[in-house]
Amino acid sequence: MKKWLLLLVAACITFALTACGSSNSGSESGKKKLIMGTSADYKPFEYKEGDNIVGFDVELAKALAKKAGYEIEVQDMDFNSLITALKSKQVDLVLSGMTPTPERKKQVDFSDVYYTANHMIVSKKDSGIQSLKDLKGKTVGVQLGSIQEEKGKELSPEYGFKTEDRNRISDLVQEIKSDRFDAAIIEDIVAEGYFKSNDDLQGFVIPDAKAEEAGSAIAFRKDSELTDKFNKALKEMEDNGELEKLKKKWFTGEK
């Protein structure tokens, strides 16, 4: 009798554990909650406000997910870990100001581009840095795994500067202010946010940068059904003006 009861209890525990696991790792078509990976150091796209992660990308993700029949849970991690987390199914999608470069497209799929920005050289106002030529012999910071890191490597041989990487944009800004970096390459809309709270910083847009080099898109696993669903929702938001309203809200302060 005791043996029978023990077997019954063991069976119940096994069933319960299996049920819990499947509720978190079910197929994309069967679950209603999606985990969004992001690097919450990229204001106004994604950043921490108290205990919450907010920003343009976060609000966009929630709006798109709602149209597609899902809810979004946001998970913060270093930018260079995002694609690995997506491929290993730790997250279901990535919104983090990520550019769909050819190298990234080999690993994951992307939505249509939802925002295009420019690269900016950020430095102290008293640095004497006013153009790319002024970077000769300087140390320029870039975010690890970012499109700005690629841009830095592309420009450094021509303009004679060296690059160093950091995990977070806030780290780059701190290194400039501490004189460990002479400058950094940061997306313009993000840099503008730092200028507002750091009046000792300045910046200029890198000239002749191709627009598609700085376009942002949503990353999904290869052959994910979510890609088409989110593209459809994104097209709807573009057509009805919702996307433009979000851009004005987060980038210009317009309601």
UniProtKB/Swiss-Prot annotation:
Keyword Membrane applies: yes
Specify the superkingdom: Bacteria
**Annotated lipid attachment (N-palmitoyl cysteine):** 20
Which CDD domains does the entry link to? Answer: PBP2_Ala
| Topology term for the membrane | Lipid-anchor
Q: Where is the lipid attached (S-diacylglycerol cysteine)?
A: 20
InterPro entries recorded: Iontro_rcpt_C, SBP_3_CS, Solute-binding_3/MltF_N
An example molecular function term from Gene Ontology annotations:
amino acid binding
Residue stretches in coiled coil: none
What Gene Ontology terms describe where this protein resides (cellular component)?
outer membrane-bounded periplasmic space; plasma membrane
Q: Which residues form the signal peptide?
A: 1-19
Gene inactivation effect: Cells show impaired growth on arginine as the nitrogen source.
Does the keyword field hold Signal?
yes
> What Pfam families does UniProt report for this protein, alphabetically?
SBP_bac_3
Print the keywords alphabetically: Amino-acid transport, Cell membrane, Lipoprotein, Membrane, Palmitate, Signal, Transport
**Which family does the similarity line name?**
Belongs to the bacterial solute-binding protein 3 family.
Q: What does this protein do?
A: Part of a binding-protein-dependent transport system for arginine.
Its recorded name reads: Arginine-binding extracellular protein ArtP
